């Protein structure tokens, strides 16, 4: 038999197999049921799925019930579909003032008290760079206020600012500091936007082990005027008045489950399918008086994709195992996924791929926008799955937005796991996106449900292609996460 004929036969067999997979998804997919999940998760009943509101328990319970009903199982040793997370809810102070020399900063206007207890007094100031261990060398900060630049070198995305700050608080406390002030000097993210978002109750992972934290403060210093004055000794002390600070402990829930693969060897590897199920809750009413931010696009549609995948793969398990994850508190700083990445219920080196979902909206129903397309060897599998349902996969059209590093996938990419985000189709961050993004208008009634169905089905097929692939997905050569990936998986 000629090589050409052999190749044609092989291609025909492969094409038949792919078509069979698509047909299997089509026949198993209950469109009305999927849309009913969508309507419930984006309903007023859940009050915008804010992790600090009691309705969030109903959302997590609903997702776990679907996992159980469809046949996904609890992870060994968990005795639950939940990964409980110790959160700390810190409300703004009733009074917040920090005076540096002749300049007084007031809460919400140049000052944000983000965490910690009340504090009143006059304290010495010590500048310690970015607040990392090496920055403390030769410096006595006991009983003083540590002053640092916000974020960390080359880590200035919004998510990075929060994660770096949490690390700094712990280190400053161990060094004996009474408070941490970060000077906010990131002009790319306007202070007014930051203040509007953060001058409200803040949620963090509680790493205090029952001990009291220290005040964590941001001061507006876009021109580095204040931090330079402190560093030169022109300003040596701060008068601090933080009163009425309330901190409360609550429990958050990641919803997790697995479906075991069929291959005796490959079933020890996991394809993680994830989406955050929280949103921003209740806020400022729009012109129609609607104050519930339902979050259909962001990210009920993604949560439903994971629920649909649970149903399909429980009845049609692939060669590799499937790890299903619905994250909490993405909107609070990627907290749920971050907690899992540091406290994994499955060894990270066994998670060979993360197909994450997060969304702000869509403006093109002929495409799927894959944030991270072009960075892993699994690209053709995703592109083919999307094409099989009549759509086209495109890469990030707005790299200046830094979307890859603003969603849950980045917590796993940093560990070395290939992790693109499978998003609704958008070609730019235009008015069609912003009129729904974090707005009360983001509800199911304004969503193209025919497009949602294609999106959900293509997600399942993409996951199936990866889970059945004979090769293990890798980062493309030269990617910034390639080296850490080789460490994780033990590759040369």
What are these regions (language model features)?
Residues 1-25:
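Bacterial Sec-dependent N-terminal signal peptides
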Residues 22, 104-107, 112-138, 204-295, ...:
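Soluble metallo-hydrolase cores and metallopeptidase-like ectodomains found primarily
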Residues 22-28, 44-54, 69, 86, ...:
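Second-shell loop/turn segments in exported
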Residues 26-46, 51-74, 138-140, 144-151, ...:
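Catalytic-core environment of secreted peptidases
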Residues 47-145, 152-154:
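Noncatalytic luminal/extracellular "stalk/propeptide" segments of secretory-pathway proteins
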Residues 107-208, 260, 397:
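Extracellular/luminal Protease-associated
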Residues 214-225, 318, 327-431:
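Metal-dependent peptidase/peptidase-like ectodomains
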Residues 311, 315, 430-491:
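His/Asp/Glu-rich mid-to-C-terminal helical/loop segments that flank catalytic regions of hydrolases
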């Amino acid at each position: 038999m000629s090589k050409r004929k052999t190749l044609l036969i092989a291609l025909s067999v492969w094409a038949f197999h792919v078509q069979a997979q698509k047909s299997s998804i089509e026949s198993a997919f209950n469109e009305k049921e999927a849309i009913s999940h969508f309507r419930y998760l984006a309903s007023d009943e859940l009050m915008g799925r804010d992790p600090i509101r009691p309705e969030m328990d109903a959302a997590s319970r609903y997702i776990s019930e679907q996992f159980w009903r469809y046949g996904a199982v609890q992870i060994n040793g968990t005795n639950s579909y939940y990964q409980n997370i110790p959160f700390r809810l810190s409300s703004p102070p009733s009074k917040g003032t920090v005076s540096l020399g002749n300049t007084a900063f007031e809460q919400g206007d140049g000052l944000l008290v983000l965490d910690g207890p009340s504090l009143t007094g006059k304290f010495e100031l010590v500048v310690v760079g970015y607040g990392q261990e090496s920055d403390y060398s030769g410096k006595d900060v006991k009983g003083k206020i540590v002053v640092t630049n916000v974020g960390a070198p080359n880590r200035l995305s919004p998510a990075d600012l929060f994660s770096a700050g949490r690390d700094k608080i712990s280190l400053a406390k161990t060094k004996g500091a009474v408070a941490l002030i970060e000077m906010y000097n990131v002009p790319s993210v306007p202070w007014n936007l930051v203040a509007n978002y953060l001058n409200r109750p803040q949620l963090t992972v509680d790493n205090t082990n029952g001990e009291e934290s220290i005040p964590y403060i941001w001061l507006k210093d876009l021109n580095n005027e204040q931090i330079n004055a402190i560093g030169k000794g022109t300003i040596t002390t701060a008068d601090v008045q933080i009163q009425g600070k309330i901190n409360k402990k609550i429990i958050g829930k990641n919803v997790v489950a697995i479906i075991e693969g069929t291959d005796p060897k490959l079933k020890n590897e996991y394809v993680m399918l994830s989406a955050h199920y929280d949103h921003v809750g209740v806020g400022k009413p729009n012109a129609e008086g609607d104050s519930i931010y339902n979050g259909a696009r962001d990210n009920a549609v993604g949560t439903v994709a994971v629920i649909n995948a649970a149903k399909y793969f429980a009845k049609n398990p692939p060669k590799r195992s499937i790890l299903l994850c619905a994250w909490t508190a993405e909107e609070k700083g990627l907290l749920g996924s971050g907690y899992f990445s540091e406290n994994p219920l499955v060894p990270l080196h066994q998670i060979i791929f993360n197909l994450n979902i997060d969304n702000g909206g869509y403006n093109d129903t002929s495409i799927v926008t894959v944030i991270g397309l072009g960075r892993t060897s699994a690209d053709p599998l995703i592109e083919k799955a999307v094409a099989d349902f009549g759509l086209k996969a495109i890469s990030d059209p707005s790299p200046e937005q830094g979307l890859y590093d603003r969603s849950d996938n980045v917590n796993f990419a940093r560990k070395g796991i290939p992790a693109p985000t499978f998003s609704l189709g958008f070609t730019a961050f235009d008015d069609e996106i912003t009129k729904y993004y974090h707005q009360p208008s983001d509800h199911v009634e304004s969503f193209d449900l025919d497009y949602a169905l294609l999106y959900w089905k293509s997600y399942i097929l993409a996951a199936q292609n990866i889970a059945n692939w004979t090769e293990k997905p890798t980062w493309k050569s030269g990617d910034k996460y390639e080296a850490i990936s080789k460490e994780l998986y033990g590759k040369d």
